[in-house]
Amino acid sequence: MPKSSRTCRALCGVDAARVTRVPLLTRIVVAIDPAAGSGEHSDETGIIVVGKDAGGHGYVLADLSGRYTPTEWARAAIAAYRTHGADRIVAEVNNGGEMVEATIRMVDPGVAFTAVRASRGKVARAEPVAALYEQGRVHHLGALARLEDQMCCFAHDFDRDTAGYSPDRVDALVWALTELLVTPVAGEGIFEAYRRLAQQSAEGGP
């Protein structure tokens, strides 16, 4: 895990996204990137809470990521779901499959849940979210140092083996913002949505 660096966060532009309050939010999701294990040297489980306002801006509300057992991360995510009044939990199921949802249902059978499966690489999945940041459409409530450090170190040539860790917090962030803001318009596929966001970013549009 990279050390906290205020200078690094300033240079990569994350500080410019920081806010001290949020407007009325129309949707809130809790996103989970479950780790494959829970041992001392296992990756952490990413748990990120993000909201969306009526103007199409996203607000990163909390980072609850950490090294958990499956039951522990399910409890942490559901506690965040209740605390923030979220309307859905979104979880990657590449590691664990149906057991991810089953673990959550064991803690609270009534939560709204969406399973997502990664079919593209981490960098490719993050590109449309990076475009949202470039457009100034994503804001961080207060300081989220460990998430922001991961964001600043997550370049196009990121290599997990070289870095010595998985960008679990960034993965969860990407799933949350994709669920809220990377939504295809009618008749538009997800790749067309990605291209549309990239074009808006290049043109400086909303």
Predicted regions and their residues:
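RNase H-like, metal-dependent nuclease domains and their acidic two-metal-ion catalytic environment used
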Residues: 1-116, 138-206
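Short, surface-exposed amphipathic charged segments that create phosphate/polyanion-binding patches used
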Residues: 125-136, 153-157
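Conserved beta-strand -> loop -> alpha-helix junction used to position metal-binding or nucleic-acid-contacting
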Residues: 110-132
